[in-house]
Structures are given as C-alpha cells and as structure tokens.
C-alpha cells in the first residue's frame, strides 16, 4: 500500500482520519452503553430497570463483554475471506446502530435482542478497522507506531464522550435515552465513514485471501445457519421453552473458551513442526497469556462491582450536583491520555540505558499494580461497611492504579504476541491471545456476582480476594519470568527472514 495521500492527517495517510473518527464514534456507543449495562439491569422496575439480581446481571455483563472479543475471531475471518475490511466495517457499524436502536425500546425482550446485535456488529467491525490502520502504511514505514498511537487516542476520546453523554442522559432523562444516544453516535460514525471512504485508497476494499466461489457459498450457508440458530434459540427463550441461567451459562462459556485456548495452543505447539527455540518462546508467551486473563478479570470490575460501589457507597454530591455514576469510568480514559506519553518515554529511556525488562516481568508488574487498586478498594469497602459514604478519591485512585497496570501490560502483551509467536502463525496466535480477553471478562462478571449491597460486610472480602489472587499470580509470573527472559531472547530462523504479520484477528489495542 502506498503511503502517499494528498489529504494527510497530521502527517499520516488521510485514511487514518476516516478510521480514527469511525472508531471514535463506535467506541462512544460501546462504552456509553457498557457503563450503564449493570446499572440498568439491577435497577428496580420502578426506576425503569430490569430488576434482576446482581449475580445474574454481572454474569450477563461478563458474557456480553467476553463474547464481543470472541466474535472478533469469526469477524476477522469473514473480512479476510468474504467481504474485505471496508464492507465488514460498514455492515458491522450498521448492525451496531440497529442494536442500540433496539436497546432504546423500553422492553426487556428487545433489550437482549439489542445486546446480541451489538455483539455481532462489534465482532465484525472492531478487528477489521484496527487491521486497516496497519494496512495504510508500507512494510517499513516508520509512521506506523505513531499512527496507531493516534488511532488509540480516538478510542479513548470516544469512550470519554460515551461515558459523559450516556451517563448524563441516563441520570437526567432515562436509560433508553442514553441507549438512543449511543445509536446516534454510531450513525454519526457511519455517515462520516461513507463520506470519506475514498481516503482509504483501496485499503480493505477486497478480501486479502478470498475463497473460491464454492467456498464462499458454503461459508455463507454456515453463517446464515448460525444466525438462524441464534434467532430460534432467542425466540424459544422468550417463549419459556428454553430456560437460561446466566450464571451457569457464563461458567460453561468460560470453561469452553478456556478449552478452546488450551487445545489451539497445544495444536500449534505439538503439531506444527516448531523448532526447539520456537517452543521455548511459546512457553514464554503462555505466561503472558495467563497474566492477561487474570488482569482483565480484575480490571473489568470497572463496569460491574466498582460501578455498583460508585452507585451505592460513594458520595457523589458536589454542592447540589450529583455526579452520574457512569462518569467515574472515564477516569481510565483520562489517565491513559495523560500517562501514555510518560510510559512511551519511560520504556525508551530504559532501552537507552540497556535495561530492557522481559515481557513476562513487565506483564507481572502490570498485574500486581492492578491488584494494588483492589487493596485501595478493600479499605474503601471497610469504611462503607461502617455505614459511611466514601469519598470519590478512593475510586479515582483505584482507576489510576488500574490504568498504570494496563499501560504496563496491555501494549506489552500485544507486542509480545508479535515477537514470540512463530511468524507463520502470527495471525492465528493473535486470535488465540484475544481469547484471554474473553476468558478474563467472563470470569470478571462471575466474580462481581459476589457483590451484595445487602451484605456490605462481605464486600471488603471480595476485593481483597481479587487482590491477593492477582498478586499471587503476578509473583509467580515474575519469578518464572526471570527464566523466561532467556527464552524470549532466543533466535529462530524466521527472525532474520520474515516481517511481522498483521491479520484481522487482532489490533494494537484491547480497547
């Protein structure tokens, strides 16, 4: 792909602006709704919510966020084989928009239909828009990392807007106005995308590895059959023929995703003709995958138990103004914007001093720092258990520590996947790694189910257990990382002959 473009965007190809703005509005819709999901489901019927238990609501939340990541795997495949990135992003955005429109309808059944549509649409849009950013640049273009940094800013700007607007609307006008605003945001992104698609200059216009005519026909038949199956199961559930326990379902799905991860990883390790050095690198990568799953199981408490703590036990009054509960969650976006330049400079400075911590050590540090945020919440919950409303600073401090942990782990882990995976399996390994997000998110929802506002004395135990478990795993990874750093440095035959592969199953951000 030529990187020349007559309408440059801060010195980058003009197509970056198209993808930046589209992703900004998509993330606005996603995070705006995500911040309200558990709050809406646990609100009473009189408050306009669904009135379901916290354990069920957080399990549904975990299933939703975990499945969104999982659906990126077939979404990337569909773009690579059938649609091309441009059409995948377009159709995915349309499905997301209709999902939010359905969510705006005040009906419990349409709520779950809306969630399914958002999951399907995000799975089609999210992995492919990130892959197209990379395709804007030629193989050795030094602007690539900077381009992804700009793209990442769009993600955080979108999440900030989503938390701000949807959080305000939910508090002052009602839940469904907030869901409707998410639909408007996605519509704005789609309009901009359609009007500026030409700036992509052919990037993602066609599938990169198209199937034969017969293969395409068979694939579409499988896709249609899958969608029909989802529709039938949904209908039977609404009619009471099938009864779904969201907690049990989340447990089964977490086990299923873990088994898929283990089997896929084992097949690549044992059945792919890897060299000894490649296998040792995969052992080093496995540590990072474990750290990732554990990290997200704690970090994603932001939308569930920490969100509920903000609602139930945090003093949100500033004079006569009550801070909307969802607004606390944009602390993460704000801290990422403020801290990202510092961390980028910090890693460079360490490299200049010939101090380069191993991937496993960095990820272990990120996990332990995230866990320290729950030590803060342990003390905050103890104050709440004594009958006090706690100051907002407790939650903000927790989100600060979580963000520091994220910046130590998330971009480092993605870099590790590209560095430690055998080059010929780089795209597949990124897809396997994405499963750690799914596993972590579902476990997060199950853990949050132990939050019980009617038994506030037990909440400190929830947070200290999450903290101690994460710290324990982090210490083990740190100790093993002292050995795995030698595995990470091993050379393979491909290292000197091949360039990194970027597929549609992964991007440079987890957001």
Question: Language model features by range: what are they?
Answer:
Residues 1-14, 139, 170-305, 312-317, ...:
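Intracellular loop-helix junctions on the cytosolic face of multi-pass helical membrane proteins
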Residues 72-101, 105:
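Conserved MFS/SLC helix-loop-helix module at the cytosolic interface between two early adjacent transmembrane helices
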Residues 81-93, 278, 349-368:
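Cytoplasmic membrane-interface "Motif A"-like loop-to-helix N-cap segments
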Residues 68, 143-171, 178-189, 193, ...:
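Glycine-rich segments within core transmembrane alpha-helices of 12-TM secondary carriers
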Residues 94-112, 364-387:
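C-terminal ends and interior cores of transmembrane alpha-helices
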Residues 99, 110-125, 386-408:
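Hydrophobic core of transmembrane alpha-helices in multi-pass small-molecule transporters
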Residues 35-58, 302-328:
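Short amphipathic helix-loop junctions that connect adjacent transmembrane helices
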Residues 58-79, 126, 330-343, 439:
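Central cavity-lining transmembrane alpha-helices of secondary-active solute carriers
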């Amino acid at each position: 792909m030529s990187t020349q473009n007559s309408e440059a965007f801060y010195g980058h190809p003009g197509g970056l602006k198209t993808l930046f703005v589209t992703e900004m509005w998509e993330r606005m819709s996603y995070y705006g709704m995500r911040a309200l999901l558990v709050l809406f489901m646990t609100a009473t019927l009189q408050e306009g919510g669904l009135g379901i238990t916290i354990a069920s609501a957080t399990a549904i939340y975990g299933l939703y966020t975990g499945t969104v990541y999982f659906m990126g795997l077939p979404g990337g495949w569909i773009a690579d084989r059938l649609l091309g990135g441009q059409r995948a992003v377009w159709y995915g955005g349309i499905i997301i928009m209709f999902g939010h429109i359905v969510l705006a309808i005040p009906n419990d059944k349409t709520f779950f239909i809306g969630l399914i549509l958002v999951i399907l649409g995000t799975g089609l849009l999210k992995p492919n828009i990130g892959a197209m950013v990379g395709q804007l640049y030629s193989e050795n273009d030094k602007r690539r990392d900077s381009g992804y940094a700009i793209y990442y800013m769009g993600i955080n700007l979108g999440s900030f807007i989503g938390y701000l607007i949807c959080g305000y609307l939910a508090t002052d006008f009602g839940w469904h106005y907030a869901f409707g605003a998410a639909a408007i945001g996605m519509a704005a992104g789609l309009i901009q995308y359609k009007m500026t698609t030409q700036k992509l200059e052919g990037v993602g216009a066609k599938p990169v590895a198209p199937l034969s005519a017969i293969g395409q026909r068979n694939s579409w038949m499988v896709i249609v059959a899958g969608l029909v199956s989802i529709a039938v199961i949904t209908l039977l559930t609404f009619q009471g023929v099938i009864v779904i326990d969201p907690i049990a379902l989340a447990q089964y799905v977490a086990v299923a995703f873990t088994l898929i991860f283990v089997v896929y990883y084992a097949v690549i390790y044992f059945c792919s003709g890897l060299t000894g050095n490649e296998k040792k690198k995969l052992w080093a990568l496995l540590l990072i995958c474990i750290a990732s799953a554990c990290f997200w199981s704690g970090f994603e408490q932001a939308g569930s138990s920490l969100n509920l703590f903000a609602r139930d036990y945090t003093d949100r009054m500033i004079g006569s103004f009550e801070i909307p509960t969802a607004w606390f969650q944009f602390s993460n976006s704000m801290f990422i914007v403020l801290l990202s330049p510092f961390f980028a400079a910090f890693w460079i400075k360490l490299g200049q001093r010939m101090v380069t911590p191993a991937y496993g050590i960095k990820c272990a540090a990120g996990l332990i720092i995230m866990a320290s945020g729950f030590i803060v919440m342990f003390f905050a919950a103890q104050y709440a258990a004594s009958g006090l409303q706690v100051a907002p600073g407790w939650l903000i401090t927790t989100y600060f520590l979580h963000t520091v942990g994220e910046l130590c782990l998330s971009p480092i882990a993605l870099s590790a996947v590209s560095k430690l995976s055998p080059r010929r399996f780089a795209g597949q390994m990124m897809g396997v790694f994405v499963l750690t997000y799914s596993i972590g998110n579902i476990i997060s929802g199950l853990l949050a189910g132990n939050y019980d506002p009617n038994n506030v004395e037990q909440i400190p135990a929830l947070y200290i257990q999450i903290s101690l478990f994460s710290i324990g795993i982090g210490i083990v990874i740190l100790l093993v990382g002292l050995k795995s750093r030698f595995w990470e440095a091993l050379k393979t035959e491909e290292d000197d002959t091949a360039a990194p592969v970027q597929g549609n199953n992964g991007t440079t951000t987890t957001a």
